[in-house]
Curated annotation (Swiss-Prot):
PROSITE patterns: ACT, ASPARTOKINASE
One GO location term (cellular component): cytosol
Catalytic activity from the UniProt record: L-aspartate + ATP = 4-phospho-L-aspartate + ADP
Protein name: Aspartokinase
Organism annotation: Pseudomonas aeruginosa (strain ATCC 15692 / DSM 22644 / CIP 104116 / JCM 14847 / LMG 12228 / 1C / PRS 101 / PAO1)
Native organism taxonomy: Bacteria, Pseudomonadati, Pseudomonadota, Gammaproteobacteria, Pseudomonadales
Superkingdom of origin: Bacteria
UniProt family annotation: Belongs to the aspartokinase family.
Keyword field: Amino-acid biosynthesis, ATP-binding, Diaminopimelate biosynthesis, Kinase, Lysine biosynthesis, Nucleotide-binding, Repeat, Transferase
Signal sequence range: none
GO MF, any single term: ATP binding
Amino acid sequence: MALIVQKFGGTSVGTVERIEQVAEKVKKFREAGDDVVVVVSAMSGETNRLIGLANQIMEQPVPRELDVMVSTGEQVTIALLSMALIKRGVPAVSYTGNQVRILTDSAHTKARILHIDDTHIRADLKAGRVVVVAGFQGVDGNGNITTLGRGGSDTTGVALAAALKADECQIYTDVDGVYTTDPRVVPQARRLDKITFEEMLEMASLGSKVLQIRAVEFAGKYNVPLRVLHSFQEGPGTLITIDDEEESMEQPIISGIAFNRDEAKLTIRGVPDTPGVAFKILGPISAANVEVDMIVQNVAHDNTTDFTFTVHRNDYLNALEILKQTAANIGAREAIGDTNIAKVSIVGVGMRSHAGVASRMFEALAKESINIQMISTSEIKVSVVIEEKYLELAVRALHTAFELDAPARQGE
């Protein structure tokens, strides 16, 4: 008998019919002897509908009141799923984040989980009940309802699995696992049977939408085995777990190709090359809560420097205005921007033990006449910025160059 936490997203519980299907799936696990805790999101589109109502009252709704409002979406879903289970003869009980005491900080709309009181859940499991918990929400120390931000239901599922020391946390989605890259771009992309927390964290941070990045961080911190599965198709999915050094010797060098279209590039030219120049440029950007990704600094012959960095495209206009003001303040020549870029990355723990991986990447892009504008590396990742129109060509070229189209071979 295993203790399993299952999380179903908004699409998986988007209609009453789908909720009935989820109940059938949960019932099978109970019949197999497993203890099950289910975490569900609001029905697809419901959170946006509720936010729309709030926006009709206030253009910028008060965060505390918005949390009270949007948390009702999950309350509907947990009750419906519990009813569907009880109808099938499966004892079930539903809990909101407040009822199950998912304690968070007080950062409304983006709260972080601090502690979970598992007393009620363990008592219900011992009594043979399936426990259905509302994802995405909790309560702060003053009893205020909080929400965890977009994708927070994944985090709820992982946090519950960690608190309960579950054998596995299963994340059900509209895909049957984690792929080597987006199959819509590369039809030959393969589903991965297994991937490490490190690799998944890199892929999530680089734009992979399969798992929410905070959930992966939480799972890695508390060593919660994650499995990504399709909600309505049978299959083994993808297991996300710790790196097994002996096993990884037989894994391919690269596990996946990630990409992100949501990047923008900013450059400030002719900056006097003096100590502290990076802080003078990035300090005001940071003060505006704009997150900087990749950075490149070039020193010219006339004791000036060109400083380039990337930000999320949503922050582009704000960051460009700040950079223009900074250019005037520090005597730089100009500040310019470019939104026609994209980031492509190769990810794999195999890079640690193999030399020449970056060179192989650059060669593959050069063969397609794709110019690299910026480069960033980590222990298990190499990222490049290229012109956006070449993005899909680059992904396909790299997928082929690292033999991800074909079955992985030992000793690759």
